Amino acid sequence: MLQPKKTKFRKAFKGRIHGNAKGGTSLNFGSYGLKAMEPERITARQIEAARRAISRAIKRQGRLWIRIFPDVPVSSKPAEVRMGKGKGSPEYWAARVKPGRILFELDGVPGPVAALAFERAAMKLPIKTKVIARLGDTSHLEG
């Protein structure tokens, strides 16, 4: 699973995800992409599950790019522990995703295969997503 090698701080504020994505909103590598339509924290496990779903759907052909990285440590307190006594220890890593952000990109596969792969990946993610194509026309994805 993805996680940073080294961080400046061990724990992070919870924070809120405001506004739309400024960068990472257009296809840079592949012909097809999966775009986030809602703000949410996506965990490293969810990213890995979506990556596996895409890899299985495309049957090891084409190329996949992961455009998000889990760089926020999410801490939680153990079960049945009273409030106070400091913040819990970091449990997992997450990526803060804003609407409009490209999550995954695919190239070297036909449109219908890419659409199927992204639909399967979307089921593993906690947000609404949209399949986009470099041509801007997604009518050939339904074929």
Swiss-Prot record:
Q: Which GO MF term does the entry hold, naming one? A: tRNA binding
Which Pfam family, any one of them, does this sequence belong to? Ribosomal_L16
Q: Which UniProt keywords apply?
A: Ribonucleoprotein, Ribosomal protein, RNA-binding, rRNA-binding, tRNA-binding
| Gene Ontology terms describing biological process | translation
Identify the GO cellular component terms for this protein: cytosolic large ribosomal subunit
The family database entries (Gene3D superfamilies) matched by this protein are listed as:
Ribosomal protein L10e/L16
Cross-referenced PROSITE patterns: RIBOSOMAL_L16_1, RIBOSOMAL_L16_2
Q: Check the record and name the HAMAP family matching this protein.
A: Ribosomal_uL16
Question: What's this protein's family per the entry?
Answer: Belongs to the universal ribosomal protein uL16 family.
The subunit structure is:
Part of the 50S ribosomal subunit.
Role according to the record: Binds 23S rRNA and is also seen to make contacts with the A and possibly P site tRNAs.
Name of the featured protein: Large ribosomal subunit protein uL16
| Gene encoding the protein | rplP
